[in-house]
């Protein structure tokens, strides 16, 4: 028995063809990089403080990403790159020893100077070897405090970057304006300073890090007071406390928290 058929008039398209075309478009359309954004945290910073060029929604299918000083991807402007297949970063000619590249694409500057001010560009190389650049800028202004006047504890702030994060991503508990006259800094899980809750401490006189019972091997403490979490889980969600020990042995606790949500499939 022959199958019935209908003759198409000019301008008509078979519905099967439409479905097939739509299916192919849906299947073959690659994920765009339009959702990728980069922000400077903070965008305006005082000299000798820290800046994070925070990347949101970095594609997980990249071969490698690069950070450059300025708008050009010239070799002498390369700060560093991160190769995803081996989970390793490599520093470039423009690296000053104060920059750190994270696996989530973000670039951290420690103790910025006026010379660091300007434009930086993230170059993303995908599986098809296509390059997508995204630029960001931050400004550096001189400190308004006299050079002999140490920062007060009232100026110290701690923020979670980002405050809401998907499982498996990274978080930085970023400390602004940490006093330089501290004896030590401590990080605790929760809002109280207890031995069992200690993640790590940094002894300023000896430039030494001591890990605590609550350290999970995924946290890194920096000498600027910041605490970095790699590959967070739902169990990491909650409050943390920065404890500053001053020269007169006074303590000041500063709480901060972040939320962890399930990764979108």
UniProtKB/Swiss-Prot annotation:
Gene3D superfamilies in the record: Immunoglobulins
Tissue expression summary: Abundant in seminal vesicle and traces in epididymis and prostate (at protein level). Highly expressed in seminal vesicle, minor in colon and placenta and, to a lesser extent, in small intestine, caecum, stomach, salivary gland and bone marrow.
One Pfam family named in its UniProt record: V-set
Localization in the cell: Secreted, Extracellular space
Keyword annotations of the record: Glycoprotein, Immunoglobulin domain, Repeat, Secreted, Signal
GO CC entries: extracellular region
Positions of glycan attachment: 44, 87, 224
Coiled-coil positions: none
Site label Not glycosylated, positions: 104
Keyword Glycoprotein: yes
InterPro entries assigned: CEA_cell_adhesion, Ig-like_dom_sf, Ig-like_fold, Ig_V-set
CDD domains found in the cross-reference section: IgV_CEACAM_D1
Leader sequence segment: 1-33
Domain Ig-like V-type: 35-142, 155-262
PANTHER family: CARCINOEMBRYONIC ANTIGEN-RELATED CELL ADHESION MOLECULE 1, CARCINOEMBRYONIC ANTIGEN-RELATED CELL ADHESION MOLECULE 19
Biological function: May interact with other CEACAM proteins on the sperm surface.
Similarity comment: family membership: Belongs to the immunoglobulin superfamily. CEA family.
Protein name: Cell adhesion molecule CEACAM10
């Amino acid at each position: 028995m022959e199958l019935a058929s209908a003759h198409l008039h000019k301008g008509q398209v078979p519905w099967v063809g439409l479905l097939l075309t739509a299916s192919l478009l849906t299947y073959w359309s690659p994920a765009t990089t339009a959702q990728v954004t980069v922000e400077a945290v903070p965008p305006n910073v005082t000299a000798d403080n820290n800046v994070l060029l925070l990347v949101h929604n970095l594609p997980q299918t990249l071969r490698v990403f690069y950070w450059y000083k300025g708008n050009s991807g010239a070799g002498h402007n390369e700060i560093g790159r991160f190769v995803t297949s081996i989970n390793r970063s490599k520093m470039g000619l423009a690296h000053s020893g104060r920059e750190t590249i994270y696996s989530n694409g973000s670039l951290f500057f420690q103790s910025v100077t006026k010379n660091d001010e300007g434009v930086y560009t993230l170059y993303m190389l995908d599986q098809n070897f296509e390059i997508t650049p995204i630029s960001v800028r931050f400004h550096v202004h001189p400190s308004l405090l006299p050079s002999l006047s140490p920062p007060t504890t009232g100026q110290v702030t701690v923020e979670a970057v980002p405050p809401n994060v998907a499982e498996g991503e990274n978080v930085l508990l970023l400390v602004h304006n940490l006093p330089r006259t501290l004896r030590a800094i401590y990080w605790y899980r929760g809002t109280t300073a207890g031995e069992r809750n200690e993640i790590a401490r940094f002894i300023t006189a000896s430039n030494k890090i001591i890990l605590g019972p609550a350290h999970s091997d995924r946290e890194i403490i920096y000498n600027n007071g910041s605490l970095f979490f790699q590959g967070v889980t739902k169990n990491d969600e909650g409050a943390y406390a920065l404890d500053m020990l001053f020269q007169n042995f006074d303590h000041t606790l500063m709480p901060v928290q972040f939320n962890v949500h399930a990764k979108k499939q």
